[in-house]
């Protein structure tokens, strides 16, 4: 069995490159691995991301500028969970992810965790 059998794939509605670069710059040991772009005459603007794979601190993710308009969007029912080694890193990441986002649970002790926060990013 592969080390990471399940990967996140997000459809970004034209913002895949911005989102991918934001994450790669935010997390240490991260990089873009592969980018395939839509050609001229494709279902979306030429150069938009058909499919991209990137690595965030050893974990693989994928994104796409999906061409059809979907009735669905991101949902908090499926979320990415970040674990940090120290409070400095927790605060740095939470602060950056909260910029222009919606904090649904500020960093706090909620009983099930001494330091937990939940943010819906931009």
Predicted regions: what is each one?
Residues 2-5, 9-11, 33, 55, ...:
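Vicinal oxygen chelate
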Residues 9-58:
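Core segments of cupin and vicinal oxygen chelate
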Residues 46-47, 73-75:
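Short glycine/proline-enriched turns and hinge-like loops at secondary-structure junctions
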């Amino acid at each position: 069995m592969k080390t990471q059998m399940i990967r996140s794939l997000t459809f970004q509605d034209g913002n895949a490159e911005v989102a991918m670069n934001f994450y790669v710059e935010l997390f240490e040991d991260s990089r873009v691995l592969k980018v395939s772009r839509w050609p001229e005459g494709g279902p979306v603007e030429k150069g938009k991301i058909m499919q991209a794979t990137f690595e965030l601190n050893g974990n693989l993710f994928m994104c796409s500028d999906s061409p059809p308009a979907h009735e669905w969007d991101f949902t908090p029912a499926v979320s990415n969970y970040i674990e940090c080694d120290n409070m400095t890193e927790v605060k740095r990441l939470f602060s950056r992810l909260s910029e222009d986002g919606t904090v649904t649970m500020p960093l706090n002790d909620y009983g099930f965790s001494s330091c937990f926060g939940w943010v819906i990013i931009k």
